[in-house]
Amino acid sequence: GLCLVGSEMCIRDSNYSPLIVVTHCEDQKTVEKNEKIFDEKYGENVSAEHHHLIRDVESCYRSSSLAVGLAKKYDADLHVFHLTTEKEMDLFTAGNVDGKKITAEVCVHHMFFNETFYSKLGNQIKCNPSIKYESDRTALIKALLENKIDIIATDHAPHTWDEKNNTYTQAPAGLPLVQHGMQILMDLYDQNIINLETVVEKTSHNVARRFQIKDRGFIREGYFADIAILDIDKPYTVSKENILYKCGWSPFDGHNFKSSIFMTLVNGNIAFKDGIIADDLPFGMQIEFNR
């Protein structure tokens, strides 16, 4: 994604709309400056191992600090996607999502990977904003537990293997994540880092609250049943045979998760059960909002 927080107007004028301003925060000028530096130094040899240095901490902080600063100046309703750096955490305040006008999100892959994985996985984990340092990964989890970060997402982007198996500059950014996102969080639960209540709150309750989604995000009578049922005692090894994406690959290929997904329900319909996808898909519906 390209950051569009380049003008005060987009946030200033948001008060004339009932919608929340949502931003992917990377400063494009900083990224382009870094791209030029690495191109001059490495030429055709620039690789995914340089990605977090090109789309670096400063590019994220400059953009997110601008967005948050403008939101405070104009009392705007702002939600920042895909936080990736420890430095950005000071921009956000702890508290209940219902009491905030400035909220934030973290993605599951930024809670799992760090810069050491680039040497093995390369373009498979090339994504924007980039996966950064271990200190950033642990800071994101800490901020989540402190309620500075309100929502957990996947930023699922299932590019084909042929697209990703290209040179660094030609390979698209993004990775498939929705199949294993919950298992990443269950691994953190198994490590006593996060509790189940927090997982449910950040992946479901707070999403519905923040965006005022009608009749979703909770297990309640009259609500749509969008539910994942897990076996937290049944390990699961990712392989090409059990990857369900049409793109056919996952950066977690070969990884052993501590839990398994037994069943998923979409709008009250069983979409997946015990390794089998339902024949009569899709069950999707257009969501509605209470605004």
For every predicted segment, state its role.
Residues 1-6, 10-11:
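Single conserved hydrophobic/aromatic residue that forms the stacking wall/gate
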Residues 12-23, 180, 184:
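Alpha-helix-loop-beta-strand connector modules within alpha/beta enzyme cores
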Residues 18-22, 26, 67-83:
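Divalent metal-dependent hydrolysis catalytic cores, especially in the metallo-beta-lactamase
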Residues 23-37:
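Short, solvent-exposed beta-strand-terminating loops
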Residues 33-44, 115-121:
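Short, flexible, mixed-charge acidic loops at enzyme active sites
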Residues 45-75, 124, 145-152, 157-232:
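His/Asp/Glu-enriched, well-ordered alpha-helical/loop segment
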Residues 77, 81-183, 187:
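Active-site neighborhoods of metal-dependent hydrolases
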Residues 167-170, 221-287:
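C-terminal cap of metal-dependent C-N hydrolases
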